[in-house]
A protein has these predicted regions:
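Short, aromatic/basic-enriched loop-to-helix "N-cap" motif that marks the start
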Residues: 48, 62-78, 92
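Hydrophobic-face residues of short alpha-helical interaction/recognition segments
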Residues: 29, 33, 72, 76, ...
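ATP/adenylate-binding site constellation spanning eukaryotic-like Ser/Thr protein kinases
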Residues: 26, 51, 81
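Short, charged helix-capping/linker segments at alpha-helix termini
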Residues: 12-20, 30-52, 67
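Amphipathic alpha-helical segment used for protein-protein interaction
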Residues: 12, 105-116
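Conserved short alpha-helical segment within the catalytic ATP-binding HATPase_c
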Residues: 54, 58, 80-81
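Short, basic/polar amphipathic helix motif occurring as a linker/hinge flanking DNA-binding modules
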Residues: 87-107
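N-terminal module of bacterial RNA polymerase sigma factors
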Residues: 1-24
């Protein structure tokens, strides 16, 4: 089916169109996300980011100007990369929080807690 027709249906919140887009592009999106996350994330993390990509498409479908993008595939690829980068930022943030020195100020006392 033509991508333009799929996108028009998706804009009207046609669940069939979303299912068709998932069928067509889930392998492609999984490859993008795997490439960015396989060293840090688990299989479940990768699956979650892939799902988040399609959820984001669904939630923003009516606001997207599809003429701005060359194809549904390229638009989904952009969403997937952004979602994977968001995941990596959150992952790095968790790791940094665990390795940071924390300075607690209690009145006049300063206590330095070290996490190793």
């Amino acid at each position: 089916m033509d991508e333009i027709i799929l996108m028009r249906k998706l804009k009207r919140k046609d669940e069939w169109a979303l299912g068709k887009i998932i069928d067509l592009y889930s392998s492609y999106i999984t490859c993008i996300v795997w490439e960015l996350l396989h060293k840090k994330g688990t299989k479940e993390d990768i699956e979650e980011v892939v799902a988040d990509t399609f959820i984001s498409l669904w939630l923003t479908a009516e606001r997207i100007n599809y003429k701005k993008y060359s194809s549904v595939k390229s638009y989904l690829g952009m969403i997937a990369r952004n979602k994977a980068k968001d995941w990596l930022r959150a992952y790095r943030g968790e790791i940094l929080e665990l390795n940071d020195d924390i300075l607690l100020i209690d009145g006049k006392r300063k206590i330095l807690l070290r996490y190793s």
